[in-house]
């Protein structure tokens, strides 16, 4: 049975194009795979807290088994979020591009799930850290909407895209290196160009859902 974790990052509800497109994929996936289980984590409309000094102290405690009750409480939400990730086979992230990057809620989610000794580890080689991801056998689908055009590979604005490339880096760091990106561009200008981009994204998502 497939297990999907859907993380929605847009602060908008029905007006969110990234959310709508991700739900197109999820509905088609459930239709093709009736036994699939979908869990949703809302980080756009219900933002997660930013990490604090207490969180950092607890997360990087040299002896995790000796964390105080207060430290354990500081990591409780992170532990829950990491558990949701470990319990999934496929991660679906829907996010708009905001100011060339992702909404703060999604950045906070990444900060909560990239955990030393939990989702990544490292060894020192002559004083240099060699990082090792701890997640295995997971895939990710990033569904994104962009206000302008040309932010994809080979586009004239590719260098300004710090959204899905950054997500690829963060996910790969913890072991999710099979990542597919589906984007709709031109939301701000709208019109036929944006409609065509959405239609193309929908068709690709439907094909991915049925072939997964």
UniProtKB/Swiss-Prot annotation:
Stored InterPro entries: Flavodoxin_fold (IPR003680), Flavoprotein-like_sf (IPR029039), FMN-dep_NADH:Q_OxRdtase_AzoR1 (IPR050104), NADH:quinone_OxRdtase_FMN_depd (IPR023048)
Major enzyme class: oxidoreductase
Cofactor(s) required, per the database record: FMN
Entry's cofactor comment: Binds 1 FMN per subunit.
Effect caused by changing residue 131 to F: 2-fold increase in specific activity towards methyl red and 20% decrease in specific activity towards balsalazide. 2.5-fold increase in the kcat with NADH as substrate
Domain of life: Bacteria
Entry's EC annotation: 1.6.5.-, 1.7.1.17
This protein's UniProt keywords: Flavoprotein, FMN, NAD, Oxidoreductase
Annotated GO MF terms: electron transfer activity; FMN binding; NADPH:quinone reductase activity; oxidoreductase activity, acting on NAD(P)H as acceptor; oxidoreductase activity, acting on NAD(P)H, quinone or similar compound as acceptor
Record's catalysed reaction(s): 2 a quinone + NADPH + H(+) = 2 a 1,4-benzosemiquinone + NADP(+); 2 a quinone + NADH + H(+) = 2 a 1,4-benzosemiquinone + NAD(+); N,N-dimethyl-1,4-phenylenediamine + anthranilate + 2 NAD(+) = 2-(4-dimethylaminophenyl)diazenylbenzoate + 2 NADH + 2 H(+)
Annotated residues for binding of substrate: 99, 131, 188
Known regulation of activity: Azoreductase activity increases with salt strength.
Annotated residues for binding of FMN: 10, 16-18, 97-100, 145-148, 187
Site feature Important in the architecture of the active site, where: 131
Function according to Swiss-Prot or TrEMBL: Quinone reductase that provides resistance to thiol-specific stress caused by electrophilic quinones. Shows a preference for benzoquinones.
Note: Rate of quinone reduction is higher than reduction of azo substrates, suggesting the enzyme is better suited for carrying out quinone rather than azo reduction.
Family of this protein: Belongs to the azoreductase type 1 family.
Assembly and interaction partners: Homodimer. Homotetramer formed by a dimer of dimers when the ionic strength is high.
The name this protein goes by in its record: FMN-dependent NAD(P)H:quinone oxidoreductase 1
Gene symbol of the encoding locus: azoR1
């Amino acid at each position: 049975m497939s297990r999907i974790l859907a993380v929605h990052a847009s602060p908008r509800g029905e007006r969110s194009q990234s959310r709508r497109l991700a739900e197109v994929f999820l509905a088609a996936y459930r239709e093709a795979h009736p036994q699939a289980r979908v869990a949703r984590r809302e980080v756009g409309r219900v933002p997660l807290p930013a990490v604090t000094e207490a969180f950092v102290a607890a997360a990087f405690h040299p002896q995790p088994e000796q964390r105080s009750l207060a430290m354990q409480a500081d990591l409780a939400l992170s532990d829950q979020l990491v558990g949701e990730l470990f319990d999934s086979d496929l991660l679906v992230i829907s996010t708009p591009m905001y100011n060339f990057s992702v909404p703060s809620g999604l950045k906070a989610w990444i900060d909560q799930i990239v955990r030393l000794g939990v989702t990544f580890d490292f060894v020192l080689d002559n004083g240099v850290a060699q990082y090792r991801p701890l997640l295995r056998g997971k895939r990710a689908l990033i569904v994104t909407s962009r206000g302008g055009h040309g932010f994809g590979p080979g586009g004239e604005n590719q260098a300004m895209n710090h959204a899905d490339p950054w997500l690829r880096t963060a996910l790969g760091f913890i072991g999710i290196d099979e990542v597919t990106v589906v984007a709709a561009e031109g939301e701000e200008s709208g019109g036929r160009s944006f409609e065509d981009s959405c239609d193309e994204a929908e068709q690709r998502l439907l094909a991915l859902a049925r072939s997964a």
